[in-house]
Amino acid sequence: MTHLPPINLVGLINRYAPAQASILQQLEIRDIISLSRVCKKLSHVYNTTIKTQYNINNGLRRFFNSPIEFRNVQAETDAIICNSTALYFFLRRPFTGISIFVGKGTSATRMLDYLKEDGWHEVGETVAHEKYDGLHYFDKHAAICPNRVRRNETDNWNPCFCPHLCLGATCESALSTALFDPHVTEALNIITWSHAYSLLPYTTFILKRSFLLENAVNRSPQRLGQVLRSKKHILDLPTEPLDLRDAQNANPTALSPPALSRQLVSRVDHGHRRMGDRHTWTIALGTDGIRQPTKSTIPITYASFRIIPEPNPPPIEDNHGRLRDTPSYYYVLFNSVAAPCLKYEYLVDPTDGGNPACSIVARRYKEISFTQIEALEDVEKPPRWTSNGSTSLRHGWGKFGCEVPVSWKWYDDEVEELLRSRWDRDSPLEGRLI
């Protein structure tokens, strides 16, 4: 008689794929990290989870007829999946809605055309918004859904679980908008065509803490109240203002004992940051079937920023003209370098004195663009161009909506060389949570 070896937890996880998937799916990522440190035989659990349970195509299959084709369009247009959609991906939870940012102009037009070809129906008209060139809402109801007849976002309807989509055509680059738009730190997550980035994974997924960001408090007390009431507690986390200990650590005062200040370590302000650095949880997504884009990846992979505490914000005025206190918050700080003589927009941390790119400001490239445009023949100049600079030079040539002249010279090599000289000397990017 053959005796089967006894089955224990290690054996279930290592030898039986269905049991492995079932067990790991029930564990939060911080528990998986703890499990991987129990013994050598379980040290592979984290890597196994990343390989088997973070398949972006599975999450997108509910929204698009072909996830691969959507990701090809995403790569072509530099679109970014953001907000709660990206957070749900890191949580390994299914999502019923998807939020996408894409730069206005040809990229937004290409994405809109694809969505309509894929069967999405635009709800109502494009919504005007001060931060976007346009907000587009789409739905894709199933055949049995009673809401299929809904044609305007103001119509009465019952909530359903059919896919819905929000596309923001951004005035700035999609990346800069994705970093500025969130109201709370737990929402600082983005998904590109090839990678998923969580900028504050330790705070969000290990400590389970969420803090206010500038965008939640810089308008009015009423706006802050709306943010706090409408915020979905995806992680069952209360939203906190700035951690007082972090503020003391960042700005020591005479009231802060030196011994206490030395003991306090900020959980959010990690100093000069780069997308995909050791403080970022980076997941490389499968790219089988994806057409490698011809565009440079440096604007995203070399984007630098800093998340800084604002412990004493000034009071803000309510609708009745009364000053009200403002809770402390964090803000994402970066400078945008964009001009018609640059193919891409670059994000640079202005506080990083060791970054040679800080010595190159957007003004230089605006002036270069101005002189190049002035040297063009009248038929080659952008529409409505006048020498007094009435046409904006804050964006790339694509925002002009006309063909690039044959003689036009690009200066991206200069910026990219500066970025490489700053970051390539650092240690390799870790790209993992543990």
Roles of regions detected by a PLM:
Residues 2-47:
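N-terminal Skp1-binding subsegment of the F-box domain
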Residues 78-79, 115-137, 234-239:
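Short secondary-structure junctions
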Residues 35-43, 47, 57-112:
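Active-site nucleotide-donor binding segment shared across nucleotidyl transfer reactions
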